[in-house]
């Protein structure tokens, strides 16, 4: 019996020594966290990467990725993250909350304590809670409405606010500015680059080949006609108009000559 008791005591002592060695090794292997690494860890937890429950290892991989993406020189490992979370939070309480079917804990609405400020390496200016000012900031603009007296016979006039008036005035100012800019541009363009009107060259109409052929044919026919008519024939030939105007000479017979003499003598006699 004594041998058995000694064996059990030695086994318990060995376990204790192993636990102490593990704790010492963990303390020795703890890496120093920078401010940037701590902020990245807190951001990952706020986004929903909580290493609790059945899928805690997968969430841990996501946390490590975010830390390494944000700080490429970081040498933090999964064990370092576990140790940091163990110092900040009570992981057993987290697991109780995230355990499926744990209705008793949900009914109690158990709340986990937030970590102490001393555990962080963040600067004091960030961790200090600023006191809220007693007077809230007046963000809303006061709109003053002008009252207009209306008589029963007159139509109702719509009440315009100061904001609407300011909008109208700004629109008018913008339009006037645009007009001034356009005028200045026109005057500058005229003074810098005056437009010189060049004489327009006469438009040359293209000659169609068919019309050319017709005109050539007409010219050739006219030249042939002129050549066919000689100058002697032109002098001898009489036009019908000239034939009509010339008087017809009477025939040279003795009877006709006697009659003409009688007529002339009668016309010379004085009247009785």
Curated annotation (Swiss-Prot):
Comp. bias regions, Polar residues: 1-12, 194-203, 229-238
Pfam families for the chain: Eaf7
Cellular component GO terms, alphabetical: NuA4 histone acetyltransferase complex; nucleus
InterPro entries on file: Eaf7/MRGBP
Coiled-coil annotated spans: none
Biased composition (Basic and acidic residues): 13-22, 131-182, 209-220
Alphabetized UniProt keyword annotations: Chromatin regulator, DNA damage, DNA repair, Nucleus, Phosphoprotein, Transcription, Transcription regulation
Name under which the protein is recorded: Probable chromatin modification-related protein eaf7
